[in-house]
């Protein structure tokens, strides 16, 4: 009954959510059991099967696959990610409504998340992008769900813990956690947050990161998330590094970019002629990572303007109307439904731990082969849908600029600042430390839409929208409680007059002393609440 009431009261968003659900059912029918993202998916699956870290990438997604292994179904993994995509839309809608925005505006903010074809494609892929985005949106929901009120320590700690978990899926989660801690420290200085809240958030956010690093150290003898941070930063410098300017020491000269036309930065890691392949121990050995980090820092210090220009160029790619072909056409094709079933990853390619792609797929999928199959006509429908239904980078830039402009004008746009900072961080950090990739934009969209819609919220949400009762959550409704109705005033009742007592006849007994006369009724009750004062009733959902 409560669900039916909720659907009726939020019919516009319910229709959008139902259409988005149908779209995800179509994706599940079109590409079975799950779409495969090359070496990335192979690495995560190997971690999920053997609990062995891959030094080239953080393996938190592998732990998710390990947790989902008992049903032995890769299709279940894709289904879960579709649910997370829908859940992000629901959380954005709920927050927008809490901040007093109308249903149409709250629903509009969810459209890029619910219906973007590239969001849908990544939900179908065995990659951590969608779980990462969900953790970020859920953390924002916990932090912002009570507009105009102090954040409780427990809720803030839970949000920090979620951001710590997100760092195990994408390392940029560490930067988001640092932003939250910086905001809390600033709030502490102006007495808007207590020291207990800040300490709880710090410990909660550090817990998953420290636990993963400890697990990584048992295999690699290095307390870290990966063994590739230096390698990726080195690749960033390959688009501009000039060793005649850098003058690296002899041990690092091998890392100078090869002569000739420069490639996209990240390709220098995977290219067959990469200088990394000439070093002993491989591309991701501890020694290689250390040398690459030293070279990268020298290059940035020697050529800061060139570094800034390279980063600016790649950040600008995020806002092109047409999706840029970067790093190369082969990478871009991986984000297309049209190429989902292309066997561009050899089935016998080796995976961490000594397995193969085909063998690991079968091992996870109850012994059955699990290559991606495109099922017609559903796959053809999705290919057509992807040609038109996506958020161009230019519109993402407009969403970010709109949120920033409104915040600058209104100054106190409650709730918009933190999601805006998160969205910009997700867009900027990858080109800052590695390279631009189209998939890095998708997790930024929910936070960007949330920031834009909250920037237009009332300066302070009405009190009846800030206080949502437990009964509202229990019935599944999300409407604010109705304000209390004052009780009608009752007219004062005059005290009855006592009839005069006749004086007694003459008596030989002397008259007694006079007793004090009681005060009138009005004076006796002046210290009590007036009968005309309405009694406040608790709000109901």
Annotate the PLM regions:
Residues 104, 142, 146-164, 196:
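Short hydrophobic alpha-helices at membrane interfaces in multi-pass membrane enzymes
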Residues 39, 77-86, 108-143, 153-154, ...:
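Multi-pass, polyprenyl lipid-linked donor-dependent membrane glycosyltransferases
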Residues 226-363:
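Membrane-proximal stem/loop segments at transmembrane-domain junctions that anchor or position
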Residues 75-76, 309, 313-419:
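Membrane-interface anchor segments at the N-terminal boundary of transmembrane helices
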């Amino acid at each position: 009954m409560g669900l039916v009431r909720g659907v009726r009261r939020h019919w516009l968003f319910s229709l959008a959510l139902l259409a988005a659900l149908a779209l995800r059912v179509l994706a599940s029918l079109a590409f079975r059991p799950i779409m495969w993202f090359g070496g990335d998916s192979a690495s995560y699956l190997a971690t999920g099967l053997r609990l062995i870290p891959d030094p080239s990438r953080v393996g938190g997604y592998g732990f998710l696959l390990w947790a989902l292994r008992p049903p032995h179904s890769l299709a279940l993994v894709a289904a879960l990610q579709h649910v997370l995509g829908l859940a992000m839309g629901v959380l954005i809608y709920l927050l927008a409504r809490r901040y007093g925005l109308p249903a149409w505006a709250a629903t509009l903010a969810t459209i890029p998340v619910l219906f973007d074809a590239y969001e849908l494609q990544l939900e179908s892929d065995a990659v951590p992008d969608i779980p990462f985005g969900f953790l970020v949106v859920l953390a924002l929901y916990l932090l912002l769900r009570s507009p105009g009120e102090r954040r409780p320590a427990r809720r803030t700690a839970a949000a920090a813990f979620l951001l710590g978990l997100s760092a195990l899926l994408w390392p940029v989660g560490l930067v988001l956690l640092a932003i939250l801690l910086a905001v809390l420290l600033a709030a502490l200085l102006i007495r808007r947050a207590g020291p207990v809240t800040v300490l709880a958030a710090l410990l909660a956010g550090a817990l998953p990161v420290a636990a993963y690093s400890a697990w990584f150290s048992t295999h690699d003898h290095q307390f870290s998330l990966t063994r590739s941070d230096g390698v990726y930063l080195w690749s960033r410098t390959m688009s501009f590094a000039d060793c005649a300017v850098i003058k690296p020491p002899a041990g690092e000269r091998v890392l100078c970019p090869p002569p000739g036309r420069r490639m996209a930065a990240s390709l220098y890691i995977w290219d067959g002629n990469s200088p990394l392949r000439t070093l002993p121990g491989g591309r991701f050995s501890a020694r290689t990572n250390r040398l690459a980090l030293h070279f990268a820092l020298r290059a940035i210090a020697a050529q800061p303007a060139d570094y800034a220009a390279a980063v600016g160029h790649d950040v600008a790619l995020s806002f092109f109307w047409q999706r840029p072909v970067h790093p190369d056409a082969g990478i871009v094709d991986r984000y297309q439904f049209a190429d989902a079933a292309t066997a561009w990853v050899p089935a016998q390619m080796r995976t961490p731990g000594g397995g193969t792609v085909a063998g690991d797929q079968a091992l996870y999928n109850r012994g059955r082969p699990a290559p991606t199959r495109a099922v017609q006509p559903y796959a053809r429908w999705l290919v057509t849908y992807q040609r038109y239904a996506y958020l161009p980078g230019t519109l993402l830039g407009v969403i970010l600029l709109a949120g920033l402009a409104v915040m600058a004008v209104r100054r106190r746009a409650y709730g918009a600042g933190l999601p805006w900072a998160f969205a910009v961080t997700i867009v900027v950090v990858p080109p800052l430390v590695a390279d631009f990739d189209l998939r890095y934009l998708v997790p930024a969209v929910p936070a960007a839409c949330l920031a834009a819609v909250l920037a237009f919220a009332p300066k302070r949400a009405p009190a009846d929208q800030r206080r949502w009762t437990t009964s509202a959550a229990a019935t599944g409704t999300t409407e604010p409680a109705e304000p209390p109705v004052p009780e009608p005033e009752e007219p004062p009742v005059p005290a009855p007059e006592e009839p005069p007592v006749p004086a007694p006849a003459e008596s030989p007994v002397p008259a007694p002393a006079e007793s004090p006369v009681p005060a009138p009724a009005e004076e006796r009750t002046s210290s009590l609440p007036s009968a005309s004062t309405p009694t406040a009733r608790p709000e109901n959902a």
